[in-house]
Amino acid sequence: MRLRRISFVLAVVSIFAFASFASADILAPGATGAPDVLAPGGTLLASLSGLWTNTTSTMSGTYLTAVYSDPANTFGAGDLDFVYQVTNNANSVDSVGRTTAINFTGFMTDVGFTPLGSSLGAGFVNGTVIPISVDRSGSGDSIGFSFTPPISAAINPGQTSTVLVIETNATNFTSGFYNLIDGGVTTVAAFEPAAARVPEGSALSMLGISGIAVLGAMKRKFVS
């Protein structure tokens, strides 16, 4: 009887642990919020760096993006972190007010930044400009990092962003795109998740219903 009670308690703890995970600070499609302070890292799977110039040639700089298999990922050990860093050259006369990454349709995301970029290696540095807010499009494909208002909070000439982070439940990736926005849009090569698992809403619903059903069945068994 004691063993049954212990099993019942463990089942309850497991279900509430999942509920706590499900209510974590996850950026759902259509949502806007404050960025989380995250700690990406792990095994570097791929990286890209390059130069960029906006369409009116009033601004230019460098960018770096990478994918890590993260043992401490929000969604599961080994799931993928997508990270980005932008530098605006000192001779630019315009500022980067926003960036967006695509395509994250069908994946769960926890979005924010880390001020400790150099800990990642791969050329990342400890940038100084943090996003004011993060958002996700209604369809879930686009993840945005906004640095304004005020304009003084943008990635101004001579400045480098903190490392911007999108933790996901993806386990595979492919080529994607990253946009730098100052009124116009400059698009550069990046990475995106691939081979989506069960869509997030369905996954949560199915697991939640299953957990309730199991708990109910166990309770009836123990009572009887």
Predicted regions and their residues:
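A short, hydrophobic C-terminal helix/tail in secreted or cell-surface proteins
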Residues: 199-217
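Bacterial N-terminal signal peptides
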Residues: 10-17
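Short alpha-helical segments used as structural interaction elements across diverse proteins
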Residues: 1-2, 216-218
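Extracellular or exported targeting regions of proteins
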Residues: 25-196
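Sec/Tat signal peptide C-region and signal peptidase I cleavage site
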Residues: 18-24
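Short, charged juxtamembrane terminal tails flanking transmembrane helices
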Residues: 220-224
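Bacterial N-terminal signal peptides that target proteins for export
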Residues: 1-9
